[in-house]
Amino acid sequence: MDARVLLGDLLEQRLSWPRSALISKDQEALPLGLIDEWKALEQKRLLGTPVAYLVGKKAFHAIELKVSPAVLIPRPETELLVDLTLQEVQNQIQCNPCKQLIRILDLGTGSGAIALAIGFQLKTQNQSNPIIEILGIDLSSSAIELAKENADRLGLTDHVKFSQSHWYDNIPSELKNSVDLIVSNPPYIHPDDPHLSQGDLRFEPRDALTDHVDGFGCIRSILSGCNPYLNQGGWVAIEHGFEQADSVRTIMRANELTDVRSVPDLAGHLRVSMGRKSS
């Protein structure tokens, strides 16, 4: 299956053939250079390189993103965080129909997957009132450049911006007490977790997977710094490992967040925890 995906992508990029050409043109001879390129990609795949890095893109939610080894590969389980954010945006609009602006902060944005998926859905739903402003933050300059490129490709540069920062360090001061939702899929894997040396994780940026401490360092930083930026009643939602839910809720309560809860994914695993700044 991976070999067909790689060939289909090459046909599309090099010959402008649709992927259906794998069937409709299966008797046609291919240029030798393309065959050599395909074999080289196959060899990399056999050595474990993720397909998303080989083809340079990955579908996520309702969008397709350009990806590279500088960023994590967007995963289906992270779509839960997007869906919960969209649900909360709708809740806020229903509770306050006169609200003119909703601000969302995406910490550790990587390729921009979460911010752009949210922005795309809200734009598709013609949410012109209230105005939606989304700011994606990442420490990696390479990730920020890629996220900006994805925003441009998706036509979302008016609504979704990206900036380099270590968590809250370089966030504009005018955002204090004005953010409605802070969302994040931070590095949460324990540095000794054997999964880091298995599968796709071997090829992904280690700093985007683990805090190199205990798996909670980045989560603590996000939660300890969220209150100055959230408005009254604003929410923070964080993806985490399914065995971390109890600890994340404890950290949320320790930082004076209320209405704390964890939400299961389709497999029943608690993968996202949410808390609200008291109003």
Label each residue range with its predicted role:
Residues 80-195:
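Conserved SAM/SAH cofactor-binding pocket of Class I
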